[in-house]
Amino acid sequence: MSDSDGKKTLGLRGSGSRPGNVKQSFSHGRTKNVVVETKRKRVVVPKPGAGKGGAGGVAAGDASRRPAGISDAEMDRRLKALQAAKAREAEEAAQREAEEKARAEERERRRAEQEAKEREQREAEEKARQKAEEEERKRQEEAEAAKKRAAADKAAAAAPKSDAGVAPARPAPGGAPKPAAGPRKAEREREERGRGAKGRNDGGRRSGKLTLSQATGGEGGRQRSVASMKRKQERARQKAMGQVEREKIIRDVQLPEAIVVSELANRMAERVADVVKALMNMGMMVTQNQTIDADTAELIIEEFGHNVVRVSDADVEDVIKEIEDKEEDLQPRPPVITIMGHVDHGKTSLLDAIRDAKVVAGEAGGITQHIGAYQVTTDSGAVLSFLDTPGHAAFTSMRSRGAQVTDIVVLVVAADDSVMPQTVEAINHAKAAGVPMIVAINKIDKPAADPNKVRAELLQHEVIVEAMSGEVQDVEVSAHTGQGLDELLEAIALQAEILELKANPNRAAQGAVIEAQLDVGRGPVATVLVQTGTLRQGDIFVVGEQYGKVRALINDKGERVKEAGPSVPVEVLGLNGTPEAGDVLNVTETEAQAREIAEYREQAAKDKRAAAGAATTLEQLMQKAKEDENVSELPILVKADVQGSAEAIVQAMEKIGNDEVRVRVLHSGVGAITETDIGLAEASGAPVMGFNVRANASARNTANQKGVEIRYYSVIYDLVDDVKAAASGLLSAEIKENFIGYAEIKDVFKVSNVGKVAGCLVTEGVARRSAGVRLLRDNVVIHEGTLKTLKRFKDEVAEVQSGQECGMAFENYDDIRPKDVIEIFEREEVTRTLD
């Protein structure tokens, strides 16, 4: 017996993996060899004593093992840093472990919820199945009982026919009759089939996945998918529950003036295909993206059994609610003071003296071009908000807006100039707005100052000052010397105290746009005076036809602020476009609401402009076209720095002209002159007027290439005068006749090659060859024309003086007689100008 008997040969064996070949079988006799390899996880056991050395060991060792050049303090510092790093790593590891634990708990919780849900679903399915089986069992029992009753009746009927001597059959041993075993056996078979079906269904969920046992077992190919099994279970559950139809929900459907079919279906919670089908049944071949009118949509809504709620497009503005503030919520607010008066009466200088800042230096020619909004704190601590309006005749609308948003009007009248046209206009604005007025008689330091004359002239406009037993306060001031400024501030504070101005700062902000402009670096910027509430950075708002989100708030000192309360003027950044001066700013809850309101207002404005420009009848259209034929137009483009200036220029242009010529503003806007403006001007043959703005480089190059004229202005008077002069050039010249002489015909001669020649005596003035003539017979004009020839004796002359005789022949006219009178005149063209 050798050593190898009964023993295996020694050899190497891989410890990391155990490969093996298995044969996988598929349908139709297909097979496939699969290599199955199972790997063991390698466990690394740390060596004894490992990890105990390291930086700490080196640090704890003697100085000979320490790196050269490192002191004890440096080594201690490094040790502390190393310990801190280790502590930080331990803390991070603990944090990661806690996060992982929390995630594991969350996964476990979700898994438990999923299992509970599946368990409830299985229980419901099991109850439904048991109920169905119970009903089936009862039905079969009833059928078996009916069969037994029928068999018993049949046996009873056949019993009398049988032989009476035959003994009845002995019952089979076992006691119970044989047919009674039938129902129990059928019931056991059904239970076994049910248990078998349940087992198959439970295992069928994973039957579509290949497992190792299936691969080694060599059983058939791929089974039904999990999704298929879920669909089958859902169908079985619905069948067991009897497919109970859900109760139809009646909805209140908001119906605008026009609605898209898909949106209508969405609001009714109905299928789009059903809505389209209903419309087609009504004879409307539409798709889901087409718009239908409100009446048709109402019929569809009623057909589907819902309620109709008709709404208007204007209802989008209902989100801007007028909140009635409670008395306990109101808090005192600073007064808003608007300074008004005639141009150059010292309004800005007066405010400059109050603010102790140089505002006048920034205005072109010392004339205010647009509204300035400032806040001033007096020596007594009172805060006043001032609005400085322009005094030009062109800025009527801006002064009107200033009066509408103000609490007190300070009417500035120069003591040496008294009441002027814009002073009267400011008085009317203040009366129309119903705000109290304080008269500031300025320039009292000038030698020609006469305050009593100002007070007397104000009486003509129903402004009775206190010095004349009235109720209007008047203060004599001098912006140059500072005289009377304290008295003016006291008068303003007294008037504000009488008014008891209050507002609620703890609500959504509402304000008025004082001015708006398009800044090159900041985009659309609006100067807003907050009237109630508090405007904060990040608020979503709608203002006129524009909307936006407050990106930044800048006060009158140029500083960024987080919020602005009542009576505080601020610049608002973040608009999507430049609003109109005078628009109301309202804060909304969402951007969608703001956008919807702005779009509605824009569409309403377009419809209004289209309706205003459209002729109502064909006769009106023809009449307008006939009038336009006789009118010459001067087209211009206007670009200004702020919205108020552009508006004032357009209004001034509309006033220029008469029945023969007018100025047409093709486009007015805010911001720099762009290449688009040049293209429009070139197509229309119009010049571009820039007010406090300039053209960019590309616009200048395009203007030079296309020959478009660009004019820059900083004072509105210069712009108006230039446009008026250009419009005057379109007027046809006026023809003026100057009578220079009379001549009487003494005799008529016939001259060959000339025709009839009149022998005349110049009785008055002078007769000129180049002048026009009229032939008068019995003081009736029978011919008007020119002279063919004018001779003295036989010589052709240019003119003949009074008392001399001459020969005259008319151009293309020979019906002349003795004693006719010739009237001699000259025509002169006189250039006309617009008033």
Curated annotation (Swiss-Prot):
Region feature (G2): 366-370
Gene Ontology cellular-component terms listed: cytosol
Region (G4): 442-445
Biased composition (Basic and acidic residues): 86-152, 184-205
GO molecular function, one term: GTPase activity
Keywords: Cytoplasm, GTP-binding, Initiation factor, Nucleotide-binding, Protein biosynthesis
Gly residues compositional bias, start-end: 50-59
Protein name in UniProt: Translation initiation factor IF-2
Lineage: Bacteria, Pseudomonadati, Pseudomonadota, Alphaproteobacteria, Rhodobacterales
